[in-house]
């Protein structure tokens, strides 16, 4: 607190000096000090203060309208300033001495709000993170999550609007990010040893690090701690400072008012309250007498109103009475008196009931006696021991330490307690007796003091009364006696007094003004060494004032009196200052409304140089003079009962709310604890009605909310519920009277509130972006339900609430879609800034619609994520809202689709995007919009499948006509250059007059790589399988929502695949037979690559039919089983045809051997030649080559095994038949050697190819083997040369030799 004479206050005083009431001469109202008179000419006066001096009036013709307006404006500003100063006086008194309210400690702590600059800083920090300019390590998943949060939340215009409204805190940002990542983290795959909670915590920690940036967390924590403390409890000085800012009060103005109001004097503040309460009671009586009531809703409420006024004052009196008189507790609160509610002068007749006795006002004093030193000890030897004793009469005796007579110094303190208002303190000086027979020490001198609480506290020299036998007659002792003033003793001192009933003789007595309780004071006169007062006067009902000297009364210089009906007591003090202090103290005690003005002040005002305070005036008078000099006395001395506190409170509450909404907290309209405390105290002390307070608060909050500020609906709910309860007679604060103004204003507020709430629900995405503030939307819906109630008891029918919310959400759909469309256009314009003026093609329109669909889905997802919980009671309305929202999008979507060329397939991604979202939403799946979407695209899908079927059928026909049957891999060694089928463009025959149907992009089938990594089928078959799989994958990826049509599509595609594969298999079978017919019948035959390719086509057809032709339903496997059977039959036929070809070649060899049959003409000729083994070797080579090619090129092992089994069996059957036909003939040696070679090599080669022993060692083979063995034996006997090492015996050596 500034010192009144400080340089700062004086410096400001120069600027603020000319505060002169209108029409008052400067020299009379404001007297400057001599040193400043030269500055008062007005040259240095600021314009804001010069308005208080009325300028000279020019003629009407000269004064312009503008000047008049300017003058009126200045006058209004001056009136406003005065009103604020007066209001500040009332607020200061509430802060200085609260007796009704306390600063609440249970209020929710508000978060620091984010400003525009801070939001931009946060964005920059996130951008730095993306650019890699931070040290934060992050994986791709976290980067994606942060990028999404940055794009969706931080860059959102709704967040910028929330920041502008003052409702966005750092905690909101953190909570939104937490919610944003929870789904992402939950969807991540499990990692051993790493829980999802750990990942969440890590991500949040990294987010905090990004959000905080390079700022030292310790500094931030310290700042947060300090701000949190200021948000909780404020000191009186902080409260003064805050309301100076709220009301625009300058520091020096506060200092003047603070000192002049004596706010640091609790007695003065309590007295002020007593005077105010007395005034309110008198005002209540005046209203009752004059019948000047407010207009109530019922005439019967007028008498109730008076009772409520008196009851409220009684409550305040009780609160004041409960305030402790002393800080120590109840020691001096002797009794609670049964006072009536009225302390005014009028009803003091029953005072005997409250009469004090002398025992009620016993005081307790603490004394400190400090003995410093003694002077004048000359007769004692320097080494003699001296000491002092001290006592308060009637109490214990204390002694100092011993000291030598040469240095009699102690500094010893003794503490005493006494009930005597005029105690006797005795201090004695002793020396130790040296005599042998001395029984006690010798007293040298003594001093007896009678201190009072007003006595000097510092050490003083006192002359001692010397003992008779002490030679030193000039003994002096330096000591200090400090007598503390009890809390319940308000003033004391000597006064001359005379009264009618007490103190009947004019005499000087020692008086103490004692406060027994907050409402009971007594003037007590005491004698020395007495605990109880000799006489006392209870001050209830008395009025104190200054008076002139009374003739005939000798003694006393300055007179004053205490007057009561039938009694007058005259007092006189020895000086003017003491009189002023006594009058002030008694003025506080009596509770009178009249404020005594000392005669010296009136004289001083008229005296020259009167601004210099008199030497005998108290400091409080000095402050009052200074306040008067600055024009503040009117605010200090004004009677609070004469003001319309309802209007003043409305003003201070509005200004406090403005201040609160502009501070650094995201308060949402909630006052700080300190502000609540001051407003509570003001309402209680000055009788502001609770309903009026809440109506004003609601009005102010609604005004701020309507202008874009974020206001907590729970706060609105509290105030609205209070007002509703009051207006409907429920007495929430015990007040039963309801004024017409309150009722009318409540209805007006109710309607405004209803419109605001409906508007907020309509704009819920923008008023509560991302579900922030938490729970606000839910509270808004709850409040709307309360507002719609006709009274406070009958709940509103749910259907009525539902209809209101339905209407709001219908409008919300339009608002949301309109803003979304505008945003999409802005985004599009920014993207295409360089292509301004280009034509909007159907493709561009479709592209824009797809982008708009993405935004629509994003909005619906955000609604579900952030707002669905609030609408839990009305979830069906949210579904209706979503359908309405989508129906608006449907208009734009339909328009974009209408302009697309016929048979264009570019719109399928739009269907997939929307359908994938809708089918995952339980409420929207197969809803109105979803069915509309299906109706739009079903014909397109059918048309697409028709064209694909036709295209694929024709590609099969043409492909097989031109088919080379070369395997795909052997077409070229460079796979990327292979002319693979175009996934996105299954070719349609040129003869069809349609656009080429292009499939939307999708992932390649899983079997694609496997096909092209091996020597598989032909180009035509691979193209077929690719297209069939691509088509089925595409249709499957559509995820058609309607089950029946989906089954129909699947069934049709499976049937199509079955037909196509069947056609492929049959065409391959025909080509296979044709190919075989064209090949050689001799041992020169080599299995061509095309034969293997055809087999592989069968292999692929079998593999693909499992996927392309099988259905997961019951009837079902008919397509798959049918095509499987066809493939199996075809493969059997192909194997049979190929084996027949091999048998034909073997028969050709045997035909050649037949020429050597015994008895033929040809054999007789050939008997003279010696043919070699060329024929056998050629056949063996043919077998081996064919086996190797088939084994290497055909991919199905089962087919190879079946082929080799059948081939071997057929070969042996042919040989056996040939030998059986020659059963009666002996084989020619050439025949024998050739057959042995063929049979042995065939057996060996097929065994190496894996033919089973059971097949190899068949009866046919045994028959052939036995015959050849017999023939071999016969030939070895008959032929001299033998078989040249060729034998049927198993011999590895022979085999190796033959090889």
UniProtKB/Swiss-Prot annotation:
Residues 891-1068 form the MHD1 domain. Residues 38-63 have a biased composition (Low complexity). Residues 347-462 form the C2 domain. Keywords: Calcium, Cytoplasmic vesicle, Exocytosis, Lipid-binding, Membrane, Metal-binding, Protein transport, Synapse, Transport. It is a peripheral membrane protein. Its main location: other. InterPro entries: C2_dom, CAPS, MUN_dom, Munc13_1, PH-like_dom_sf, PH_domain. This is Calcium-dependent secretion activator 1. The gene is cadps.
